[in-house]
Amino acid sequence: MLFPGGQTVLHKRLESQQIFVWLLQHYLGFYLGDIVGPFYGKLFLTQDQKHAFRPLKAHSSRSSSVIFEVVGYHYTDINSWLVRLLLCKKSYFAMTSNFFHVYFFSILKTRKSVNIKCWPLKPSNFTTNEYFIHTS
């Protein structure tokens, strides 16, 4: 039996649970990812492959903040991921999910370059994709 507003309450409860899970994965991945992630295979993008990074409008008033739309592929063309990242002066950590895969991104922006590492959360499919592009 459904009560008035029951769907809204259920929706809010599910939303809060998703936020809790996201925060748990976010901070857990932050500590474990830096230890485990770099030990796995890497994929480098040269400046010739810079087309994979499409600059978007910056949502921040700071001129140092740039948003990139990162389009890449993991394993096969079918299992692709698309994520928008906010790159600031210091390291920034982000997470996105694609169906059954959860990816973590470790971003480090310097004056002349952007270094992005990405790896899935599933231990059985651990792979680190590292992207390095020049911003000059």
Curated annotation (Swiss-Prot):
<protein>
    <recommendedName>
        <fullName>Putative uncharacterized protein YNL226W</fullName>
    </recommendedName>
</protein>
<dbReference type="GO" id="GO:0008361">
    <property type="term" value="P:regulation of cell size"/>
</dbReference>
